[in-house]
Amino acid sequence: MSHSACPKPATARHSQALTGEIRIPGDKSISHRSFMFGGLASGKTRITGLLEGEDVINTGRAMQAMGARIRKEGDVWIINGVGNGCLLQPEAPLDFGNAGTGARLTMGLVGTYDMKTSFIGDASLSKRPMGRVLNPLREMGVQVEAAEGDRMPLTLIGPRTANPIAYRVPMASAQVKSAVLLAGLNTPGVTTVIEPVMTRDHTEKMLQDFGADLTVETDKDGVRHIRIVGQGKLTGQTIDVPGDPSSTAFPLVAALLVEGSEVTIRNVLMNPTRTGLILTLQEMGADIEIIDPRLAGGEDVADLRVKASKLKGVVVPPERAPSMIDEYPVLAIAASFAEGETVMDGLDELRVKESDRLAAVARGLEANGVDCTEGEMSLTVRGRPGGKGLGGGTVATHLDHRIAMSFLVMGLASEKPVTVDDSTMIATSFPEFMGMMAGLGAKIAESGAE
């Protein structure tokens, strides 16, 4: 099931000041985990603010296929979970569509069950490597039948009893860390993840909220040791999902670039493992005011007031990459309008996202007149303040929602329009994007539709 069955190109044109107030859809990471942990916990979980994109809904369907009962009443999702250790073998393969997070976390969750579970996905997901999650599962006793290169379609055959392991995560990946911790939920004894570089910590925080026996210690070198005691009880919770910082990035950068704009974005997740983009834009001279910082569901949340700003190029420290890995495409757009040179390094993870995101961004920038250099793990962008001469190109999105949204943002501020070859897959993470941007005054339309 590929999104490109009927591609819908879209075009963004130079827009007047963007103004207004918006509330961003719920955070994707927390939404996936809310469905998973709610489906696994005993009793009832109630979720408000859930991101209802296709990716998250696919995770919900997978949990239903393994015994969880999920329904929606008004704005509230209500889950009756099966209880930790009580997932059922699904009758058919679990279809994750385009959702890498949903697929990888669920592999961890079900791998240590004494049952057979098959995973399938769309053309884009079937190209993405799963070995980074499968390798620790193999150490725990899980058998894997996979397509070449540890890709989907694949089947996990769980052991009678899983072995607890201590696993040092070889790359900065919250998905790998989370998959091992979730596998540890159904494993006797203590499963340990050693994380040299901290990544988003929603799994740890939320598992603790659900009652898991999970502890985190940071040693003197800054290495995190996360221990989970398996086979404990999880209890249903009430969750209000804060707004997704990765989705916030698009209207935020648009407001910075379109002259005269002032936009307020409500209820944004400000977890420090996710705010690298805001920090970087502020270093570039962005006028971003953080209003009413508060705690909601154990997470830092705030409102952002964003005003059009003259940006200047910066060197982004590579160690910041894990806290903004999904935001580099739209940062590259901001850099295209900044004075001077912006250097982004440590981007190897971008090569294994929904597309080779680094190459896709570089090609899109070149097609629209931006002077940039793509390195093996880096991207250097030399900007043109005011966007003079930029635009006029069509961007190949490679079924990647973030590439599509980033270049539509570009077209709002560039001299000439920017077209993306497909916009259908924006629905995977931000179904309201087109309507929300139009409400602020952005000129974005499906091509052929005026």
Swiss-Prot record:
Gene Ontology CC terms, in alphabetical order: cytoplasm
Compartments it resides in: Cytoplasm
InterPro entries: Enolpyruvate_Tfrase_dom, Enolpyruvate_Tfrase_sf, EPSP_synthase, EPSP_synthase_CS, RNA3'P_cycl/enolpyr_Trfase_a/b
CDD domains tied to this protein: EPSP_synthase
Keyword entries, A-Z: Amino-acid biosynthesis, Aromatic amino acid biosynthesis, Cytoplasm, Transferase
Binding residues for 3-phosphoshikimate: 28-29, 33, 173, 175, 326, 353
PROSITE patterns tied to this protein: EPSP_SYNTHASE_1, EPSP_SYNTHASE_2
SUPFAM superfamilies, per the entry: EPT/RTPC-like (SSF55205)
GO molecular function annotations of the record: 3-phosphoshikimate 1-carboxyvinyltransferase activity
Pathway the protein contributes to: Metabolic intermediate biosynthesis; chorismate biosynthesis; chorismate from D-erythrose 4-phosphate and phosphoenolpyruvate: step 6/7
EC number(s) stated in the UniProt entry for this protein: 2.5.1.19
GO biological process: amino acid biosynthetic process; aromatic amino acid family biosynthetic process; chorismate biosynthetic process
Principal subcellular localization: cytoplasm
Residues the record marks as active site: 326
Matches recorded under PANTHER family: AROM/DEHYDROQUINATE SYNTHASE, PENTAFUNCTIONAL AROM POLYPEPTIDE
Assembly description: Monomer.
Homology family: Belongs to the EPSP synthase family.
Function text: Catalyzes the transfer of the enolpyruvyl moiety of phosphoenolpyruvate (PEP) to the 5-hydroxyl of shikimate-3-phosphate (S3P) to produce enolpyruvyl shikimate-3-phosphate and inorganic phosphate.
Name listed for the protein in its UniProt record: 3-phosphoshikimate 1-carboxyvinyltransferase
Protein's gene: aroA
